[in-house]
């Protein structure tokens, strides 16, 4: 069975401001890429963290059956949230340890639901450090943001 990897990234011009997300999905056999799919989208008024979350959500929601995959993100916010903080948030009724509402709770809950159908390994890598898959996800995120920087609207995947 091939390895499934998703590189995800978000981008924002201003924070908040126009933003985009990108995901590069790859089925691989060792170093050989068997299949590749590019996803992207954006919003007119958003934050970088929301775009990072939407990139991961979109990668998971694009899968048409339960899968085992690795999601590679340059967002410590997403990686730490899904692998650590979320357990406490759920236990506390989606409140932080200081009893404040979790920011972006709508997307965290959607990510939790999307992940529940799959077996996911989460990896963090340094952004803008020459990782080919991450650089491509960044390009997709910027392309997803582009229509919103000029006032146009669009999404494809």
UniProtKB/Swiss-Prot annotation:
It catalyses: Endonucleolytic cleavage to 5'-phosphomonoester. SUPFAM superfamilies: Ribonuclease H-like (SSF53098). Mg(2+) 2 binds at residues 9, 138. GO terms for biological process: DNA replication, removal of RNA primer. GO terms for molecular function: magnesium ion binding; nucleic acid binding; RNA-DNA hybrid ribonuclease activity. Its main location: cytoplasm. It comes from the Bacteria. InterPro entries: RNase_H, RNaseH-like_sf, RNaseH_domain, RNaseH_sf, RNaseHI. It is found in: Cytoplasm. GO terms for cellular component: cytoplasm. Mg(2+) 1 binds at residues 9, 52, 74. Its EC number is 3.1.26.4. It is an enzyme of class 3 (hydrolase). Its cofactor is Mg(2+). Pfam families: RNase_H. Binds 1 Mg(2+) ion per subunit. May bind a second metal ion at a regulatory site, or after substrate binding. Residues 1-146 form the RNase H type-1 domain. The keyword Nuclease applies. Keywords: Cytoplasm, Endonuclease, Hydrolase, Magnesium, Metal-binding, Nuclease. Endonuclease that specifically degrades the RNA of RNA-DNA hybrids. Belongs to the RNase H family. NCBIfam families: PRK00203.1 (NF001236). Monomer. This is Ribonuclease H. The gene is rnhA.
